[in-house]
C-alpha cells in the first residue's frame, strides 16, 4: 500500500500542489492528470523518493520512503522520460541486465515489504523471448538500443517492467511515443500487473486504459489538486 499524507510538492521555490491525502491499495492504479508545467513529473519524483516533499510524507506499507529508501527501492520500478535503457547494450542484453538487477526484488536477501496477501501470483513470469515477442521487438533483439527509435526504446523499458516484476510501478507518461499497437500492449501490461496485485502510478496527458473499478484519478490544476 502506498500512503500519501498531507503531501506538498514544490518546484523552483513555489508550491505546485499541497494537502494531497490518499492511499493506493494493492491491485489499484492512480492516474495523475494536468497540463504541462502543472507538476505531474515533480509529484512522481517525490513519490519515488527522488525529491523531498515540501510537506507531508509518502509511506510504503507503513515505512516512510525517505527514512527507509533501501526498503522502498527494492519494490519500486520507475520509468521516466529517459526510459533508462542502456544504448550500448542490445535489446536482449538490456532485458538480461534488468533480470539480473531485479532478482529477489532487488533485495540482497530476496525480501520485500509487500505481504504475501498483496501479490496474487496470477501472472506467471514471462520469458525474455516471450516478452520481446509481445512487445513487437523480437526481430530487433540483437540490435543495439542506441539505434532504436524513441517508441522502440519505450517498448524495451516497458518490457523490463514486466520481467522485473516489482510491485510498485511509477511511470512518467508511459504511452508517449507508442503507436496504437504498442499502446494496446501497454494497457495489457498494466492490467496484468494490477491483476497480480501490483500498484500503478502514472502521469498521463490522456487516460490510460486501466480497470475503471480499481483506478483513481488525481488532477493537478492551478486552483489545487482534486481526486475522482
Swiss-Prot record:
Compartments reported by the entry: Cell inner membrane
The keyword tRNA processing is annotated on this UniProt entry: no
Keywords of this entry: ATP-binding, Cell inner membrane, Cell membrane, Cytochrome c-type biogenesis, Membrane, Nucleotide-binding, Translocase, Transport
Gene3D superfamilies: P-loop containing nucleotide triphosphate hydrolases
EC top class, as a word: translocase
SMART domains with a match to the protein in the record: AAA
Recorded GO MF terms: ABC-type heme transporter activity; ATP binding; ATP hydrolysis activity
Domain ABC transporter, chain residue ranges per copy: 2-227
Subunit and partners: The complex is composed of two ATP-binding proteins (CcmA) and two transmembrane proteins (CcmB).
Family under the similarity heading: Belongs to the ABC transporter superfamily. CcmA exporter (TC 3.A.1.107) family.
Alphabetical list of PANTHER family matching this protein: ABC TRANSPORTER I FAMILY MEMBER 1 (PTHR43499:SF1)
Protein name: Cytochrome c biogenesis ATP-binding export protein CcmA
Originating organism: Paraburkholderia xenovorans (strain LB400)
